[in-house]
Curated annotation (Swiss-Prot):
One of its GO terms (cellular component) is mitochondrial inner membrane. The gene is mt-cyb. It is a multi-pass membrane protein. This is Cytochrome b. It comes from Anguilla marmorata. It is found in: Mitochondrion inner membrane. InterPro entries: Cyt_b/b6_C (IPR005798), Cyt_b/b6_C_sf (IPR036150), Cyt_b/b6_N (IPR005797), Cytb/b6-like_sf (IPR027387), Cytochrome_b (IPR030689), Cytochrome_b_C_euk/bac (IPR048260), Cytochrome_b_N_euk/bac (IPR048259), Di-haem_cyt_TM (IPR016174). Heme b b566 binds at H97, H196.
Protein backbone atom coordinates (compact mmCIF):
# COMPACT_ATOMS: atom_id res chain seq x y z
CA UNK A 1 0.00 0.00 0.00
CA UNK A 2 1.30 3.46 -0.95
CA UNK A 3 2.34 5.83 1.82
CA UNK A 4 -0.57 8.04 3.00
CA UNK A 5 1.80 11.01 2.99
CA UNK A 6 2.15 10.59 -0.80
CA UNK A 7 -1.49 9.82 -1.63
CA UNK A 8 -3.74 11.87 0.68
CA UNK A 9 -4.88 15.02 -1.22
CA UNK A 10 -3.92 17.40 1.63
CA UNK A 11 -0.85 15.61 2.95
CA UNK A 12 0.48 15.27 -0.60
CA UNK A 13 0.69 19.07 -0.93
CA UNK A 14 2.59 19.37 2.37
CA UNK A 15 4.78 16.41 1.42
CA UNK A 16 5.73 17.92 -1.96
CA UNK A 17 6.57 21.25 -0.32
CA UNK A 18 8.28 20.18 2.91
CA UNK A 19 9.38 16.53 2.78
CA UNK A 20 10.12 15.14 -0.68
CA UNK A 21 10.91 18.52 -2.26
CA UNK A 22 14.05 18.12 -4.45
CA UNK A 23 16.48 20.78 -3.17
CA UNK A 24 19.92 21.82 -4.50
CA UNK A 25 22.53 20.15 -2.30
CA UNK A 26 24.74 23.25 -2.09
CA UNK A 27 22.37 25.97 -0.80
CA UNK A 28 23.96 27.84 2.11
CA UNK A 29 22.57 29.35 5.32
CA UNK A 30 21.46 32.39 3.27
CA UNK A 31 18.59 30.15 2.08
CA UNK A 32 17.32 29.80 5.68
CA UNK A 33 15.61 33.18 5.78
CA UNK A 34 12.49 32.13 3.86
CA UNK A 35 11.56 29.60 6.53
CA UNK A 36 12.61 32.07 9.26
CA UNK A 37 10.15 34.60 7.78
CA UNK A 38 7.46 31.92 7.96
CA UNK A 39 8.35 31.36 11.61
CA UNK A 40 8.23 35.14 12.27
CA UNK A 41 4.79 35.37 10.65
CA UNK A 42 3.39 32.46 12.70
CA UNK A 43 4.89 33.83 15.93
CA UNK A 44 3.53 37.34 15.20
CA UNK A 45 0.04 35.97 14.45
CA UNK A 46 0.00 33.92 17.68
CA UNK A 47 1.31 36.72 19.96
CA UNK A 48 -0.89 39.25 18.12
CA UNK A 49 -3.97 37.11 18.67
CA UNK A 50 -3.36 37.01 22.42
CA UNK A 51 -2.74 40.78 22.49
CA UNK A 52 -5.97 41.39 20.54
CA UNK A 53 -7.90 39.51 23.26
CA UNK A 54 -7.01 42.28 25.75
CA UNK A 55 -6.56 45.36 23.55
CA UNK A 56 -9.27 47.98 23.02
CA UNK A 57 -9.18 50.06 19.83
CA UNK A 58 -10.68 53.22 21.30
CA UNK A 59 -8.62 56.39 21.78
CA UNK A 60 -9.78 56.83 25.37
CA UNK A 61 -8.66 53.33 26.43
CA UNK A 62 -6.07 52.10 23.87
CA UNK A 63 -2.99 53.35 25.76
CA UNK A 64 -4.38 52.12 29.09
CA UNK A 65 -5.24 48.72 27.61
CA UNK A 66 -1.61 48.24 26.52
CA UNK A 67 -0.45 49.22 30.03
CA UNK A 68 -3.04 46.79 31.43
CA UNK A 69 -1.66 43.99 29.21
CA UNK A 70 1.85 44.64 30.52
CA UNK A 71 0.85 44.94 34.19
CA UNK A 72 -2.19 42.74 34.83
CA UNK A 73 -2.46 40.06 32.14
CA UNK A 74 -0.59 36.80 32.84
CA UNK A 75 2.67 37.02 30.90
CA UNK A 76 1.18 39.99 29.03
CA UNK A 77 4.48 41.88 29.27
CA UNK A 78 6.23 38.91 27.61
CA UNK A 79 3.65 38.57 24.84
CA UNK A 80 3.84 42.29 24.10
CA UNK A 81 7.67 42.36 24.12
CA UNK A 82 7.83 39.29 21.86
CA UNK A 83 5.33 40.88 19.45
CA UNK A 84 7.04 44.30 19.32
CA UNK A 85 10.56 42.88 18.95
CA UNK A 86 9.31 40.08 16.71
CA UNK A 87 8.50 42.81 14.19
CA UNK A 88 12.16 43.90 14.25
CA UNK A 89 13.31 40.32 13.63
CA UNK A 90 10.73 40.01 10.86
CA UNK A 91 12.33 42.95 9.06
CA UNK A 92 15.90 41.80 9.74
CA UNK A 93 15.02 38.48 8.09
CA UNK A 94 13.21 40.30 5.26
CA UNK A 95 16.18 42.52 4.43
CA UNK A 96 18.61 39.58 4.56
CA UNK A 97 16.25 37.48 2.40
CA UNK A 98 16.00 40.28 -0.21
CA UNK A 99 19.78 40.85 -0.07
CA UNK A 100 20.33 37.13 -0.71
CA UNK A 101 17.99 37.36 -3.72
CA UNK A 102 19.90 40.35 -5.09
CA UNK A 103 23.32 38.78 -4.52
CA UNK A 104 22.63 35.38 -6.04
CA UNK A 105 20.33 36.51 -8.88
CA UNK A 106 17.24 34.79 -7.46
CA UNK A 107 15.22 37.70 -8.91
CA UNK A 108 15.38 35.98 -12.31
CA UNK A 109 12.46 33.86 -11.09
CA UNK A 110 10.27 36.84 -11.96
CA UNK A 111 6.89 35.69 -10.57
CA UNK A 112 8.40 34.58 -7.26
CA UNK A 113 10.37 37.84 -7.00
CA UNK A 114 7.45 40.17 -7.82
CA UNK A 115 5.12 38.42 -5.38
CA UNK A 116 7.97 38.79 -2.87
CA UNK A 117 8.01 42.57 -3.45
CA UNK A 118 4.22 42.66 -2.96
CA UNK A 119 4.70 40.67 0.27
CA UNK A 120 7.33 43.22 1.38
CA UNK A 121 4.86 46.08 0.80
CA UNK A 122 2.09 44.21 2.66
CA UNK A 123 4.36 43.55 5.65
CA UNK A 124 5.40 47.23 5.68
CA UNK A 125 1.74 48.30 5.67
CA UNK A 126 0.95 45.85 8.47
CA UNK A 127 3.85 47.11 10.60
CA UNK A 128 2.84 50.74 10.02
CA UNK A 129 -0.80 50.30 11.11
CA UNK A 130 0.37 48.16 14.04
CA UNK A 131 2.71 50.89 15.28
CA UNK A 132 -0.29 53.23 15.62
CA UNK A 133 -2.24 50.92 17.95
CA UNK A 134 -0.54 51.63 21.35
CA UNK A 135 -1.66 55.26 20.83
CA UNK A 136 1.50 56.82 22.22
CA UNK A 137 2.92 60.13 20.99
CA UNK A 138 5.02 58.58 18.21
CA UNK A 139 2.09 56.32 17.21
CA UNK A 140 -0.20 59.31 16.76
CA UNK A 141 2.26 61.63 15.04
CA UNK A 142 3.69 58.85 12.87
CA UNK A 143 0.15 58.10 11.68
CA UNK A 144 -0.52 61.81 11.08
CA UNK A 145 2.68 62.42 9.10
CA UNK A 146 2.63 59.26 6.98
CA UNK A 147 -1.10 59.34 6.10
CA UNK A 148 -0.71 63.05 5.30
CA UNK A 149 1.70 62.12 2.50
CA UNK A 150 -1.30 60.96 0.47
CA UNK A 151 -2.45 64.59 0.26
CA UNK A 152 0.36 64.99 -2.30
CA UNK A 153 -1.70 62.95 -4.80
CA UNK A 154 -2.92 65.51 -7.37
CA UNK A 155 -6.61 66.50 -7.33
CA UNK A 156 -7.92 63.73 -5.00
CA UNK A 157 -5.19 63.95 -2.32
CA UNK A 158 -7.06 65.82 0.41
CA UNK A 159 -10.23 63.76 -0.03
CA UNK A 160 -8.12 60.60 0.09
CA UNK A 161 -6.52 61.58 3.40
CA UNK A 162 -9.87 62.45 5.02
CA UNK A 163 -11.31 59.18 3.71
CA UNK A 164 -8.48 57.19 5.34
CA UNK A 165 -8.72 59.20 8.57
CA UNK A 166 -12.51 58.87 8.70
CA UNK A 167 -12.67 62.55 9.68
CA UNK A 168 -10.63 65.75 9.62
CA UNK A 169 -7.76 64.43 11.74
CA UNK A 170 -6.31 61.18 13.06
CA UNK A 171 -9.00 60.24 15.57
CA UNK A 172 -11.05 57.36 16.95
CA UNK A 173 -12.25 56.23 13.52
CA UNK A 174 -8.63 56.03 12.34
CA UNK A 175 -7.51 53.91 15.28
CA UNK A 176 -10.46 51.52 14.92
CA UNK A 177 -9.89 50.91 11.21
CA UNK A 178 -6.12 50.57 11.70
CA UNK A 179 -6.77 47.83 14.26
CA UNK A 180 -9.06 46.08 11.75
CA UNK A 181 -6.36 46.32 9.06
CA UNK A 182 -3.65 45.15 11.43
CA UNK A 183 -5.70 42.09 12.30
CA UNK A 184 -6.51 41.29 8.67
CA UNK A 185 -3.22 41.88 6.81
CA UNK A 186 -1.14 39.06 8.39
CA UNK A 187 -3.64 36.56 6.95
CA UNK A 188 -3.37 38.24 3.54
CA UNK A 189 0.42 37.95 3.94
CA UNK A 190 0.04 34.24 4.77
CA UNK A 191 -2.07 33.76 1.62
CA UNK A 192 0.43 35.64 -0.56
CA UNK A 193 3.21 33.53 0.98
CA UNK A 194 1.47 30.40 -0.34
CA UNK A 195 1.46 31.90 -3.86
CA UNK A 196 5.14 32.90 -3.38
CA UNK A 197 5.96 29.25 -2.55
CA UNK A 198 3.77 27.92 -5.37
CA UNK A 199 5.77 29.88 -7.94
CA UNK A 200 9.09 29.01 -6.27
CA UNK A 201 8.29 25.29 -6.47
CA UNK A 202 7.50 25.63 -10.20
CA UNK A 203 11.22 26.23 -10.81
CA UNK A 204 12.93 24.97 -7.64
CA UNK A 205 15.45 26.94 -5.59
CA UNK A 206 18.37 28.85 -7.02
CA UNK A 207 21.80 28.06 -5.53
CA UNK A 208 25.08 29.86 -4.68
CA UNK A 209 26.79 29.15 -8.03
CA UNK A 210 23.73 30.10 -10.09
CA UNK A 211 23.92 26.95 -12.25
CA UNK A 212 21.21 24.36 -12.98
CA UNK A 213 21.22 21.90 -10.09
CA UNK A 214 18.89 19.22 -11.50
CA UNK A 215 21.77 16.74 -11.51
CA UNK A 216 22.46 17.25 -7.80
CA UNK A 217 19.24 17.38 -5.78
CA UNK A 218 18.57 15.99 -2.29
CA UNK A 219 15.25 15.67 -0.40
CA UNK A 220 14.27 18.65 1.77
CA UNK A 221 13.68 16.37 4.76
CA UNK A 222 15.77 15.50 6.75
CA UNK A 223 18.64 17.62 5.37
CA UNK A 224 17.15 21.11 5.17
CA UNK A 225 14.37 20.60 7.72
CA UNK A 226 17.10 20.15 10.36
CA UNK A 227 19.16 22.99 8.92
CA UNK A 228 16.08 25.24 9.17
CA UNK A 229 15.48 24.00 12.72
CA UNK A 230 18.96 25.24 13.70
CA UNK A 231 18.06 28.66 12.23
CA UNK A 232 14.78 28.62 14.20
CA UNK A 233 16.63 27.94 17.46
CA UNK A 234 19.19 30.71 16.82
CA UNK A 235 16.52 33.27 15.91
CA UNK A 236 14.15 32.39 18.74
CA UNK A 237 17.06 32.56 21.20
CA UNK A 238 18.04 36.02 19.90
CA UNK A 239 14.41 37.21 20.00
CA UNK A 240 13.93 35.91 23.55
CA UNK A 241 17.17 37.59 24.66
CA UNK A 242 16.06 40.92 23.16
CA UNK A 243 12.51 40.65 24.55
CA UNK A 244 13.68 39.73 28.06
CA UNK A 245 16.87 41.78 28.54
CA UNK A 246 16.46 44.83 26.26
CA UNK A 247 12.73 45.02 25.44
CA UNK A 248 12.73 48.78 24.74
CA UNK A 249 16.08 49.00 22.95
CA UNK A 250 14.54 49.51 19.51
CA UNK A 251 11.42 51.42 20.60
CA UNK A 252 10.90 55.17 20.83
CA UNK A 253 10.77 56.75 24.32
CA UNK A 254 8.03 59.13 23.06
CA UNK A 255 5.66 56.17 22.87
CA UNK A 256 5.59 55.96 26.68
CA UNK A 257 3.64 59.24 26.58
CA UNK A 258 -0.06 58.98 25.65
CA UNK A 259 -0.99 60.58 22.30
CA UNK A 260 -1.59 64.32 22.52
CA UNK A 261 -2.68 66.16 19.35
CA UNK A 262 -1.69 69.49 20.99
CA UNK A 263 2.00 68.60 21.51
CA UNK A 264 4.26 67.67 18.60
CA UNK A 265 7.37 65.58 19.46
CA UNK A 266 10.64 67.32 18.50
CA UNK A 267 11.70 64.53 16.11
CA UNK A 268 9.01 62.48 14.41
CA UNK A 269 10.48 59.27 13.06
CA UNK A 270 9.24 55.75 12.29
CA UNK A 271 10.59 52.46 13.65
CA UNK A 272 14.22 51.68 12.68
CA UNK A 273 13.24 49.35 9.82
CA UNK A 274 11.56 52.20 7.90
CA UNK A 275 14.29 54.80 8.45
CA UNK A 276 16.06 54.17 5.10
CA UNK A 277 12.82 54.89 3.18
CA UNK A 278 12.05 57.85 5.47
CA UNK A 279 15.50 59.31 4.72
CA UNK A 280 14.84 59.02 0.96
CA UNK A 281 11.42 60.69 1.46
CA UNK A 282 13.00 63.61 3.36
CA UNK A 283 15.83 64.03 0.83
CA UNK A 284 13.49 65.63 -1.69
CA UNK A 285 12.30 69.14 -0.76
CA UNK A 286 8.95 68.62 -2.53
CA UNK A 287 5.98 66.71 -1.12
CA UNK A 288 4.88 64.82 -4.24
CA UNK A 289 8.50 64.20 -5.28
CA UNK A 290 9.27 62.78 -1.84
CA UNK A 291 6.25 60.46 -1.93
CA UNK A 292 7.22 59.20 -5.40
CA UNK A 293 10.81 58.63 -4.22
CA UNK A 294 9.50 56.76 -1.17
CA UNK A 295 7.40 54.45 -3.37
CA UNK A 296 10.22 54.06 -5.90
CA UNK A 297 12.67 53.04 -3.16
CA UNK A 298 10.67 49.80 -2.78
CA UNK A 299 9.26 49.39 -6.30
CA UNK A 300 12.77 49.72 -7.80
CA UNK A 301 13.15 46.07 -6.75
CA UNK A 302 10.61 45.15 -9.45
CA UNK A 303 12.84 46.47 -12.26
CA UNK A 304 15.94 44.57 -11.08
CA UNK A 305 15.16 41.47 -13.23
CA UNK A 306 14.62 43.67 -16.33
CA UNK A 307 17.98 45.41 -15.83
CA UNK A 308 19.98 42.18 -15.43
CA UNK A 309 22.70 42.45 -18.10
CA UNK A 310 25.28 39.87 -16.99
CA UNK A 311 25.70 36.45 -18.62
CA UNK A 312 26.17 35.03 -15.13
CA UNK A 313 23.31 34.73 -12.68
CA UNK A 314 24.76 35.54 -9.26
CA UNK A 315 27.65 37.68 -8.04
CA UNK A 316 29.70 34.67 -6.86
CA UNK A 317 32.25 35.07 -9.68
CA UNK A 318 31.78 38.81 -10.36
CA UNK A 319 34.06 40.88 -8.07
CA UNK A 320 33.15 44.29 -9.57
CA UNK A 321 29.42 43.70 -9.06
CA UNK A 322 30.15 42.36 -5.57
CA UNK A 323 31.75 45.70 -4.73
CA UNK A 324 28.59 47.51 -5.88
CA UNK A 325 26.43 45.16 -3.82
CA UNK A 326 28.38 45.92 -0.63
CA UNK A 327 28.29 49.64 -1.44
CA UNK A 328 24.48 49.26 -1.60
CA UNK A 329 24.49 47.58 1.83
CA UNK A 330 26.63 50.41 3.26
CA UNK A 331 24.35 52.97 1.57
CA UNK A 332 21.27 51.39 3.22
CA UNK A 333 22.99 51.65 6.62
CA UNK A 334 23.86 55.31 5.98
CA UNK A 335 20.24 56.03 4.97
CA UNK A 336 19.00 54.26 8.12
CA UNK A 337 21.28 56.46 10.24
CA UNK A 338 20.20 59.65 8.41
CA UNK A 339 16.50 58.77 8.76
CA UNK A 340 16.86 58.92 12.54
CA UNK A 341 18.69 62.27 12.53
CA UNK A 342 17.20 65.79 12.64
CA UNK A 343 16.79 67.70 9.36
CA UNK A 344 19.86 69.95 9.56
CA UNK A 345 23.34 70.33 8.09
CA UNK A 346 25.25 68.04 7.38
CA UNK A 347 22.57 65.33 7.55
CA UNK A 348 20.50 66.82 4.72
CA UNK A 349 23.27 66.66 2.11
CA UNK A 350 24.48 63.22 3.29
CA UNK A 351 20.91 61.92 2.91
CA UNK A 352 20.57 63.42 -0.57
CA UNK A 353 23.88 61.93 -1.75
CA UNK A 354 22.96 58.53 -0.25
CA UNK A 355 19.52 58.65 -1.93
CA UNK A 356 20.99 59.45 -5.36
CA UNK A 357 23.54 56.66 -4.89
CA UNK A 358 20.77 54.21 -3.89
CA UNK A 359 18.85 54.69 -7.15
CA UNK A 360 22.03 54.95 -9.25
CA UNK A 361 23.21 51.55 -8.00
CA UNK A 362 19.95 49.86 -9.01
CA UNK A 363 19.22 51.69 -12.26
CA UNK A 364 22.62 52.63 -13.73
CA UNK A 365 25.74 51.20 -12.08
CA UNK A 366 24.71 47.55 -11.67
CA UNK A 367 23.48 47.05 -15.27
CA UNK A 368 26.54 48.93 -16.56
CA UNK A 369 29.04 46.88 -14.57
CA UNK A 370 27.25 43.65 -15.57
CA UNK A 371 27.69 44.64 -19.22
CA UNK A 372 31.35 45.56 -18.64
CA UNK A 373 32.01 42.20 -16.98
CA UNK A 374 30.59 40.46 -20.06
CA UNK A 375 33.06 42.44 -22.20
CA UNK A 376 35.93 41.49 -19.87
CA UNK A 377 35.05 37.79 -20.17
CA UNK A 378 35.27 38.04 -23.97
CA UNK A 379 38.54 39.96 -23.84
Amino acid sequence: MANLRKTHPLLKIANDALVDLPTPSNISAWWNFGSLLGLCLISQIITGLFLAMHYTSDISTAFSSVAHICRDVNYGWLIRNLHANGASFFFICLYLHIARGLYYGSYLYKETWNIGVVLFLLVMMTAFVGYVLPWGQMSFWGATVITNLLSAVPYVGDSLVQWIWGGFSVDNATLTRFFAFHFLFPFVVAGATMIHLLFLHETGSNNPVGLNSDADKIPFHPYFSYKDLLGFIIMLTALTMLALFYPNLLGDPDNFTPANPMVTPPHIKPEWYFLFAYAILRSIPNKLGGVLALLSSILVLMVVPILHTSKQRGLTFRPASQLLFWILVADMLVLTWIGGMPVEHPYIIIGQVASVLYFSLFLVLNPLVGWLENKMMNW
